[in-house]
Each structure stands twice: as structure tokens, then as C-alpha cells.
């Protein structure tokens, strides 16, 4: 049995990576999502039960509106396209933070949590609009 039960990642630096390698912050965020998928696969292979992704902090509201909208749309598209696959792989989605997003994104987040609530292979703790100062 793997002694590691929980992995946590602060998703920071994707925009800077994107500027350096792709000349686009948005492409960096998109590549970061591919990395998340690789990490999820790794966690399942190694039987790590919990993966926390600190994805959007309360401080991230200071980013330009266009970038924030891109991040939220990226998450919406991911949930629409991948939720069934995540559910079939027995991955549970748990959201932490205040859901102060668009009605569409809030609905998708709620739906993802409800749809995957009984899954036990891997729990993804998604920290969105979350800040340690508020805790």
C-alpha cells in the first residue's frame, strides 16, 4: 500500500510558463490542465486517494477580466467534456471555496459534485475562490 494518501498542488505559474513557451498566458493555462490529467492518472496508478488542486485563489480576482473569463470557460468546457469519463473512472469531485461564479459554472460545479458523490477511487478537492486568509 502506498504510504502517500494525499497530494496537494498549488496551480501557480501556468500563465508565466505559457508566456515563456507559447507566447500566451491562456495556452499556459490550457497546458496546465493537461498536466492535471497526468497527475490524476498518476494518483490512480499509485492508489493515492486524495488530490487537492488549489486552482483559483481569492487573490486571482485581481487578474485581468479576460484572463479570468478564459479560466472559468476552460473549467466549464472541461466539466462538460470530461465529467462522464471522471465518473466512470470513479473519481469524486469536491469543491472548496465560495461559488461566486457565473450561474452556468456554479451549476456545473454543483452537478459534478452530486454526480460523483459516491465515487471512491480518487477524490479531487478543487479549491476555487478559496483563500487561506479567510480561513
Range-by-range predicted roles:
Residues 1-135:
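Flexible, compositionally biased loop and terminal segments
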Amino acid at each position: 500500500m502506498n504510504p502517500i494518501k494525499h497530494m496537494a498542488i498549488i496551480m501557480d505559474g501556468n500563465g508565466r510558463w505559457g508566456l515563456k513557451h507559447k507566447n500566451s498566458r491562456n495556452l499556459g493555462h490550457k497546458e496546465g490542465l493537461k498536466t492535471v490529467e497526468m497527475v490524476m492518472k498518476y494518483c490512480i496508478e499509485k492508489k493515492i486517494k486524495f488530490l487537492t488542486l488549489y486552482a483559483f485563489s481569492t487573490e486571482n480576482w485581481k487578474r485581468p477580466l479576460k484572463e479570468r473569463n478564459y479560466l472559468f470557460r476552460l473549467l466549464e468546457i472541461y466539466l462538460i467534456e470530461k465529467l462522464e469519463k471522471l465518473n466512470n473512472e470513479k473519481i469524486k469531485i469536491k469543491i472548496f471555496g465560495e461559488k461566486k461564479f457565473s450561474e452556468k459554472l456554479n451549476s456545473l460545479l454543483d452537478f459534478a459534485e452530486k454526480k460523483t458523490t459516491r465515487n471512491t477511487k480518487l477524490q479531487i478537492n478543487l479549491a476555487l475562490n478559496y483563500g487561506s486568509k479567510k480561513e
